[in-house]
Amino acid sequence: MVILFDRFNLPEDIFEVIFATKQQIIVAKLLIEMVKSNGGEINKTEMSLFATKLHEGNYVTTLIDEAPYKGKKVKISYNKRQFYDRILTPMKSMGLIDYDLYKKTYRISDNFNKEMIRIGLQWLREMRKPAKS
């Protein structure tokens, strides 16, 4: 996933930096909240149930902060395949969520922060290289 941002107009919400659409932002926030409410770790079955509830439009939440929905119970619908392709897989590849192959669990991770530091260090090295000509 490619993240393009304007450092002068950086949103306060990390999800707005990472995800392209409001719907993706909402679903990603709901996923993180669900994992946090389960002690920071969920199993494959719980993830599948979350994706299925979203797919069927049966996921009810009050966590949306947008103007017309704030504080109200809202049913959320999101395609299951797109959830895995556009939300979960990018979150895993960027290091926001880790999957433990042995325990078969998903957990919130700080690897994203570590990778951002590494990217910053790569830029410093590139900046300090002498010109090739």
Residue ranges and their predicted role:
Residues 1-40:
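Long, low-complexity, charged/polar intrinsically disordered regions in eukaryotic proteins
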Residues 43-72:
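DNA-recognition alpha helix
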Residues 111-133:
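Short, amphipathic alpha-helical interaction segments positioned at domain boundaries
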